[in-house]
Design a protein with these regions (language model features):
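Long, charge-rich, low-complexity alpha-helical segments
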Residues: 29-142
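Long, low-complexity, charged/polar intrinsically disordered regions in eukaryotic proteins
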Residues: 1-26
């Protein structure tokens, strides 16, 4: 298993009602991680060692553990999108924690990271140098 952490230098994220919205400053995309994906990102953000995830997730979701490849695929996607980055094992905490009490959890489903690119042009704009005198979001034609 790869050891990962949130790539805080390139993204901003916020969790609300069991969903995490992520904005990438490096590519202008934004992402939605709901349910199981939001909970995995929560565990990663708290730097919980992956050895602890099974106990935490099995307590929260029925059917967890039937397909462990889901987590590997999710982590690979997060790495390829620049949302996650590799870290060393020593920086991770071996502790069982509670997941946020902001959603109802039922069955384990494959964690998905939905990517959206419809605001890339606006998110990648330098508001000082790339806009007209009228300001953002009025872009220079250059």
């Amino acid at each position: 298993m790869k050891f990962v952490r949130i790539n805080e230098s390139d993204i901003s994220s916020e969790r609300l009602n069991g969903e995490t919205i992520i904005i990438s400053f490096s590519n202008g995309s934004y992402y939605n991680a709901a349910g199981t994906a939001a909970d995995l990102l929560f565990l990663i953000s708290k730097q919980i060692h992956p050895e602890m995830w099974s106990e935490i997730l099995a307590k929260a979701f029925s059917g967890y553990g039937e397909d462990s490849d889901h987590i590997t695929v999710f982590i690979e996607k997060g790495l390829s999108e620049g949302i996650l980055k590799l870290t060393d094992e020593e920086s991770l905490i071996r502790k069982v924690i509670d997941l946020p009490n902001d959603t109802v959890r039922n069955n384990w489903i494959e964690p998905k990271l939905d990517k959206y690119e419809d605001f890339q042009d606006l998110l990648m704009v330098d508001p000082i140098h790339d806009t007209t005198e009228e300001g953002w979001p009025k872009l220079n034609d250059e």
